[in-house]
Curated annotation (Swiss-Prot):
<comment type="similarity">
    <text>Belongs to the IF-3 family.</text>
</comment>
<comment type="subunit">
    <text>Monomer.</text>
</comment>
<dbReference type="GO" id="GO:0043022">
    <property type="term" value="F:ribosome binding"/>
</dbReference>
<dbReference type="InterPro" id="IPR036787">
    <property type="entry name" value="T_IF-3_N_sf"/>
</dbReference>
<protein>
    <recommendedName>
        <fullName>Translation initiation factor IF-3</fullName>
    </recommendedName>
</protein>
<dbReference type="InterPro" id="IPR001288">
    <property type="entry name" value="Translation_initiation_fac_3"/>
</dbReference>
<dbReference type="Pfam" id="PF00707">
    <property type="entry name" value="IF3_C"/>
</dbReference>
<keyword id="KW-0963">Cytoplasm</keyword>
<comment type="function">
    <text>IF-3 binds to the 30S ribosomal subunit and shifts the equilibrium between 70S ribosomes and their 50S and 30S subunits in favor of the free subunits, thus enhancing the availability of 30S subunits on which protein synthesis initiation begins.</text>
</comment>
<dbReference type="InterPro" id="IPR019815">
    <property type="entry name" value="Translation_initiation_fac_3_C"/>
</dbReference>
<keyword id="KW-0648">Protein biosynthesis</keyword>
<dbReference type="Pfam" id="PF05198">
    <property type="entry name" value="IF3_N"/>
</dbReference>
<keyword id="KW-0396">Initiation factor</keyword>
<dbReference type="GO" id="GO:0016020">
    <property type="term" value="C:membrane"/>
</dbReference>
<dbReference type="InterPro" id="IPR019813">
    <property type="entry name" value="Translation_initiation_fac3_CS"/>
</dbReference>
<dbReference type="GO" id="GO:0005829">
    <property type="term" value="C:cytosol"/>
</dbReference>
<dbReference type="GO" id="GO:0032790">
    <property type="term" value="P:ribosome disassembly"/>
</dbReference>
Length: 175
């Protein structure tokens, strides 16, 4: 059977099925009717015949106001989009030998990202021989996580990836 696009619901004359399982406007089962009988019944009450389940045998149709139905669907879709929250991943780059004031500035930015609800990846890039002192970088990352523990949880512990060590922080959801 052919698939129907989301906004191409079969209504009234566009219905291709010869027989329909009809549901009345109040939700009561009317039974299996021909397409013409269903259209006549809907016309008598000034409503439309809308296919609800096109893949059923016979297809399930309902007598309703199609304009109102379409409006309700759009309203529900809009509401669902509002409820969805996109979570962005922000990255903060530090060095293993970062000074305290620079650290505080980066920390302030990281806290701002977390308070907005974004995830935060804090990374340290080791240059030259600094790679031999990974524990210094790990201490910096753990200090960062420690100072954000009131608003964030550690999603991923400090981990090496090539010449870079990183930690993932995600915001604590208030409910």
């Amino acid at each position: 059977m052919s698939t129907i696009a989301k906004d191409q619901t079969q209504v009234n004359e566009k219905i291709r099925a010869k027989e329909l399982r009809l549901i009345g406007q109040d939700g009561e089962q009317i039974g299996v009717k021909t397409k013409n009988e269903a259209l006549e019944m809907a016309e008598r009450v000034g409503l439309d015949v809308v296919i609800m389940a096109p893949n059923a045998k016979p297809p399930v149709a309902r007598i309703m106001d199609y304009g109102k139905y379409k409006f309700e669907q759009q309203k529900k879709e809009k509401e669902m989009k509002k409820k969805q929250k996109t979570i962005n991943l922000k990255e903060i780059r530090l060095s293993p030998t970062i000074e305290e004031h620079d650290f505080q500035t980066k920390l302030k930015n990281g806290r701002k990202f977390l308070e907005k609800g974004d995830k935060c990846k804090v990374s340290i890039r080791f240059r030259g021989r600094a790679i031999t002192h990974k524990e210094i970088g790990q201490r910096v990352l753990e200090k960062f996580a420690e100072q954000c523990k009131d608003i964030a949880t550690v999603e991923q512990r400090p981990k090496m990836d090539g010449r870079q060590m990183f930690i993932m922080l995600s915001p604590i959801n208030e409910k």
